[in-house]
Amino acid sequence: LYKDRQENAAVHQLFKVQHRAEDMEAELLAIVDNGGRVQTILIEHPVYGEIQTYLKLTCRRDVQHFLQQVASCAFRPLSELTDGVHYHLIQADSQQDLDYVEAALRDLGFLQE
């Protein structure tokens, strides 16, 4: 069957969040479990300005692999430079999925308005 290309277009939204380092797993799983894909993390550093890197986390397996990498090295999360405040660019298949992600982050107390 033919589907309109617009129907398959992904949507994106930038979410501002804040949490402790030990809440990283809960945050990332809330995103992927609600249909979101974590594209980037970005912080606003007072001296260096915006610092951004790609994460490309699309499922629980990606999140677990990322968390294992974090745990296996002397790594401090980027968000520690800004007291846990950071942004994620989230991609999803629909606006409804982004709304689910937003609600989950709000319910966890991570979403910053």
For each feature predicted by the language model, list its residue ranges.
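Minor-groove-contacting beta-hairpin "wing" of winged helix-turn-helix DNA-binding domains
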Residues: 1-5
